Amino acid sequence: MRAFAVLLIIALGWLQYTLWFGKNGMEDYAQVSNDVQLQEEVNQGLRNRNGQMFAEIDDLRKGSAAIEERARHELGMIKKGETFYRIIDENSEE
């Protein structure tokens, strides 16, 4: 009976060790949980960026205001009859 109790305590000790420090134990679980949370934050940022891009694509397909805005800011285009004024700061290095 005494040998059985010692064997049972050893088995329980081994099970506790593997639970806390072994492969797929609590330490690994905490690390994986942290990795999952970080990845979810990255994914949410990417979802937000995708939503903005889809909204911009939809705006470019349906309206001419977005196309005009891009032409003005990215390509420096102006409409007929408009005058373009460029104001340069005296402190600028250009």
Curated annotation (Swiss-Prot):
Keyword match Cell membrane: yes
GO biological process: FtsZ-dependent cytokinesis
Major subcellular site: membrane
Top-level taxonomic group: Bacteria
Cellular component GO terms, alphabetical: cell division site; cell septum; plasma membrane
Topology class, membrane: Single-pass type II membrane protein
Function: Essential cell division protein. May link together the upstream cell division proteins, which are predominantly cytoplasmic, with the downstream cell division proteins, which are predominantly periplasmic.
Record-given protein name: Cell division protein FtsB
Organism: Aliivibrio salmonicida (strain LFI1238)
Lineage, uppermost ranks: Bacteria, Pseudomonadati, Pseudomonadota, Gammaproteobacteria, Vibrionales
